[in-house]
Amino acid sequence: MTTYRRTGILAGAALAWLALTVPVHAEVRSAAPDAFQILFNEKVAAPPSAVYGAIGQIERWWDGAHTYSGDAANLSIAMQPGGCWCERWAGGAVEHARVIMLMRDQAVRVEGGLGPLQNLGVNAVLTFLLKAEDGGTALTVGYRVNGASASGLDKLAQPVDGVIGAAVQRLKRYVETGKPAP
């Protein structure tokens, strides 16, 4: 078997695994070479105030596998306009995003290209919307990314969808159980 064929099989298996791990209530709303938009809707069995507070405790629910340092404990979000969603460790630091909107118990919005998107010079906005519903919270998370058509963002939409979808699930579990992983 040639290296190219093996690589193709492995890539296909990885994409299939990603598709299976994305929650059914997630959606890549649109994807083009210069933009994509993903959206998640989740019901959280806790009031909006608990969800809002937990968003600011990102080090407790974000997956360390999706950090530069390998440890989510190095993450923080300064919950104020202009606040940094930062990662700091002995070997370096990264500003992942910046807080651009806060509405207590209703919304959190940050601007920044997460992970490999940072190197592409994209404009990216991640929004958490919270609404009291049936004794809990209707949580809507959207990520809108725009850049140059040469960025090939359509190829990144599904993997980013998988990472953000997993993060939404971890946030939900953290709020409901105090533990981000099952």
Annotated model-derived regions:
Residues 24-74:
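Hydrophobic ligand-binding cavity/cleft-lining segments
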Residues 115-162:
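Beta-strand/loop substructures that line and gate deep hydrophobic ligand-binding cavities in soluble
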Residues 51-54, 85, 99, 110, ...:
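Hydrophobic pocket/interface hotspot
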Residues 60, 70-115, 177:
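Glycine-rich portal/gate segments that line the openings of hydrophobic small-molecule binding cavities
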Residues 17-25:
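C-terminal segment of classical bacterial N-terminal signal peptides
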Residues 2-13:
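Bacterial N-terminal signal peptides that target proteins for export
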Residues 40-42, 95-101, 124-132:
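Hydrophobic/aromatic beta-strand elements that line small-molecule binding cavities or substrate pockets
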Residues 173-182:
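Short, highly charged C-terminal tails/helix-capping segments
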